[in-house]
Every structure is written in structure tokens, then in C-alpha cells.
């Protein structure tokens, strides 16, 4: 019995201590604990005794916070390290950069006026190509208008296209005739233009031209004489060759022996004429051979006499210019 009373007393004391500790615990959130721990009168400090270790925990917390804060402040990046830190963050990657976006391309469309210009230019080029295909220099105006009408979808536009070609100087309309190649007209008119200096008999260039012309005449005579000597020498060589073949054929040998010899000699002459044509681009005839040898002798003599051929040609073009064959056509068209 005594043992039971002792055990029950011990258990009762343990229960009281446990309930008291629960009531006094700071982490308890029950209403009973709040009512018990929080006094009604703030001046009464005798009801609740502070738990052992509360002051120590507070001091420890304040000490730790005081020790941590300076360390955290010292670890903050400053200066270049801050710039590197910002570069590592690189917040611009997630941003939308509008400055790099190009505006949408505008669609280029032809206006009605531009389309008309292109069609007109195409029609004019077609007309010019057709006129070149004819190979003619002059054409009646009616035929010219009909050609212009064939180039367009509407035949009535032929007169308008003809007028545009005339205004742009692609053709020259003279009365009822049309000159398809104005460049020939220009060259012909250049020969008809009066030049006052040319008609001056005391012009020093005219005197120079006469001297060069006289010197060239002497060179031409000498070249002609040399070429004539070569031609006579060639004729003598052919006569001797023919006489030699006749003697070999009828006196020394027979025709059976001379026939292949004459064939091969003729083949050699043919090959020589073919080579002459390849070199000079002239027909292998007596006249072609004469012209080729005359030009060769003339160049050789000009080099010996130091004759200025370029100056002579320039002065000859200036003082001895002759109108071309198209002048008569132009004058006839103008008169008509």
C-alpha cells in the first residue's frame, strides 16, 4: 500500500510538471497558453518567471546577426566585379530588341504611267529591229508607217510611233522618204560642210600636204618599178621552166617519166597560191600578187625615206575629202 501511494504521488507530480511546461512554452499557440502567459497588468512581473535560457538565446541571436551582417556586406560585388556580375546576369537576352527589327519591305508596284512608258519603249525597239532586218537605208513614208503599225497591237498607232522615232532622231523623215540609218547621213553631210581654212591657199598644212604628196608619188613610182621587175623576172622563170620541161620530155626523157614530175610541180604551185591567200587574204591571181608586192615595196621604201604616213592620211582626209555615195540620195530626196 505504501508502495502504491508513493508511485501515485510520483506520477501526479510528473503530470503537473508536464502540464506546467506545456503551458509555459513560448511556441505554444493555444489560447490557454496565451491567457496564462500574457498578464492583464503589465506592471505585474511576478506571475510569470522567464524561462531559463531565454536571455541566452536572445543574446545568441543578436550576436549571430551582428556577426553575419558585416560579412554579407563585405561579400557584395563592387566596381569591376559588379560589372562582371551584371554581364553574367545579362538580362538583355530575355528582352525584345525592337531596334534590330527591320520594317517590312514595301511592295514596289508599277504605276499606269510607268507601264505605258515600258510598252512604248518595247514597241519602239520592235520597230527598230524590224527596220534593221530590211537591210535598207531608205524607205517610203507609207511603208514606214505600216511597219510601225505592225509592231503595235493597234495599227492606228503606226503614225504616232513613226512620229516618236522622228522626234528622237532614230530616223530622218525627208518629205515622202525616210532615212533608216541617220549615221550615213551624218557622215555624208560632214563632207559637204564648208571649212574656211581649207580653201585658204596659204595654209601651211596645205603646203605640207603637197610636199608629202610629192614625196609619196616618188615612192609609189619606185615601188611600181620594183614590182614590175619582179613580175618580169617571174615571167622569165616560167618561160625557162617550160622550155626545160619540153627538152626533158622530147629529147632527154620520155613523157612517162615527166608526167609525175609535172604533176608534183603543179601541186607545188597550187600550195604556194593557197599559202599566199592565207597570208594576205587576197585572191591568188596576178592582180592580187601585184597589189601584195606593191604594198610590201611601198612600206619598205617609206621606212627608208622616213615618210610620215599617218600625217599624210590626216591631211589627205582634211583637204581631199569626197562626199560618199549617199550624198546623191540625200540631195535627190530633198529635191523631191
Swiss-Prot record:
A motif (Selectivity filter) lies at residues 255-263. GO terms for molecular function: calcium channel activity; metal ion binding. GO terms for biological process: mitochondrial calcium ion homeostasis. The keyword Metal-binding applies. Ca(2+) binds at residue 259. Keywords: Calcium, Calcium channel, Calcium transport, Ion channel, Ion transport, Membrane, Metal-binding, Mitochondrion, Mitochondrion inner membrane, Transit peptide, Transmembrane, Transmembrane helix, Transport. The keyword S-adenosyl-L-methionine does not apply. The chain crosses the membrane at residues 231-251, 257-277. It is a multi-pass membrane protein. Disulfide bonds: none annotated. One of its GO terms (cellular component) is mitochondrial inner membrane. It is found in: Mitochondrion inner membrane. Residues 1-69 form a transit peptide. It holds the Pfam family MCU. It catalyses: Ca(2+)(in) = Ca(2+)(out). Mitochondrial inner membrane calcium uniporter that mediates calcium uptake into mitochondria. Constitutes a pore-forming and calcium-conducting subunit. Mitochondrial calcium homeostasis plays key roles in cellular physiology and regulates cell bioenergetics, cytoplasmic calcium signals and activation of cell death pathways. Belongs to the MCU (TC 1.A.77) family. PANTHER family: CALCIUM UNIPORTER PROTEIN 2, MITOCHONDRIAL (PTHR13462:SF34), CALCIUM UNIPORTER PROTEIN, MITOCHONDRIAL (PTHR13462). This is Calcium uniporter protein 3, mitochondrial. It comes from Arabidopsis thaliana (Mouse-ear cress). The gene is MCU3.
